Regions:
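Structural recognition of the conserved hydrophobic beta-strand(s) that form the central parallel beta-sheet
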Residues: 15-18, 67-74, 268-271
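Conserved RecA-like P-loop NTPase helicase motor core
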Residues: 50-52, 239-315
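SF2 helicase/translocase ATPase core recognition
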Residues: 71-74, 81, 118-136, 288-315
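Inter-lobe coupling linker of SF2 helicases/translocases
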Residues: 90-156, 160, 173-178, 182-185
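Post-DEXD/H (motif II) to motif III coupling segment of the RecA-like Helicase ATP-binding lobe
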Residues: 51-116
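Hydrophobic residues in beta-strands of the RecA-like P-loop NTPase core, especially within AAA+ ATPase
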Residues: 45-46
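Conserved helix/coil segment N-terminal to the catalytic DExD/H
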Residues: 2-40, 54-60, 274
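Conserved helicase/translocase motor-coupling segment
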Residues: 139-259
Length: 315
């Protein structure tokens, strides 16, 4: 309202909003109610721009009248979402190619990120898990269009089956023992577990879903708590004197926790998705990914947490 009543020729302002707020109709209408002259002068900068392709935001893009736009993302492509990808590219006017690209390899070679070593650990499903996985896969085959090479549409039954199958992989029982071995080996080699990030298995949402998707399943939160508690407990079983902190959604003293992690007062952070985007933990030296989601975006984002440069990190 104050912007609408101001002298447009003397305006100088910055509006900051989250994607969750931007997607709300009331907030969106308020932003779009600015005069056409103001909107022509504005510059829209979208960080983590891949989120623009989320269904609840994508539906509003044709009503955005701000012409000058910059989209920033280390992971611009949305997995299994051609429609969302097309919408993002069109919105920022780069249908054919990106305006500017800077690869992770270039960032490492130019000294902006540190070099790293990556060690995959293969975990196999047990007999019961494999039997259930095959059973669900046969059910999913009925939805698959061989000619198109993709699933024919997306409905509730298909989504539930995909989610159910994904949970089998993420919650595979053998992961716990492999994780225990990795933690024990690190502790024996270094005598400490300082500066370690642990990404606990998820399985609560599909890789192609967005952070704004909701769930009506009350057991999801219970599963999350059980999983993160279990992996936190394993760390403490290997080294009872190690300080471990769960980094979860809604954590009250977030900045304090990250500060204590950087000084080594908190040695290990266990998390699910809260350390994916927008969190800087440059002091981290080891990250353990307990879930191979197959989602390139998540893998890149998580590597980004540990590849930040720090004066005391010599890798």
């Amino acid at each position: 309202e104050s912007l609408a009543e101001s002298d447009e020729s003397s305006l100088s302002f910055i509006i900051i909003t989250t994607y969750a707020s931007f997607s709300r109709e009331s907030t969106f209408k308020q932003l779009m109610s600015l005069s056409k002259k103001i909107q022509r002068q504005m510059l829209l900068i979208a960080d983590e721009a891949h989120n623009i392709g989320a269904p609840n935001i994508m539906s509003k893009l044709d009503r955005v009248k701000i012409l000058r736009r910059i989209g920033l993302s280390a992971t611009p492509e949305r997995q299994f979402d051609d429609k969302g990808n097309k919408a993002v590219m069109q919105f920022f006017g780069c249908d054919a190619q990106y305006t500017f690209e800077y690869s992770m390899k270039e960032a490492i070679d130019n000294g902006f990120l540190c070099r790293y070593r990556y060690f995959p650990h293969v975990v196999r499903l047990n007999e019961d898990e494999m039997a259930e996985y095959k059973k669900i896969s046969l059910q999913l085959a009925k939805f698959y269009n061989i000619d198109e090479g993709s699933f024919s549409g997306v409905d509730d039954i298909l989504m539930r089956l995909l989610l159910k199958r994904k949970r089998i992989i993420h919650k595979a029982q053998n992961k716990e023992e492999v994780f225990r071995q990795i933690v024990r080996q690190r502790f024996e080699e270094r005598g400490s577990l300082k500066y370690t990030l642990v990404y606990v298995p998820e399985g609560m949402q599909l890789d192609c879903s967005t952070q704004y998707a909701t769930t009506d399943n009350p057991t999801d939160d219970m599963d999350v708590d059980k999983l993160i508690d279990k992996y936190t407990q394993i760390v403490q079983e290997v080294s009872p004197t190690t300080t471990v902190k769960k980094f979860i959604s809604g954590i009250q003293n977030r900045d304090e926790v990250l500060s204590k992690f950087s000084t080594g007062d908190i040695e290990v952070l266990t998390s699910m998705k809260c350390l994916d985007e927008g969190v800087d933990v440059p002091r981290s030296e080891l990250a353990i990914f307990c879930a191979s989601t197959g989602n390139p975006r998540q893998f890149i984002q998580r590597r980004g947490r540990i590849l930040r440069k720090h004066p005391d990190k010599h890798i």
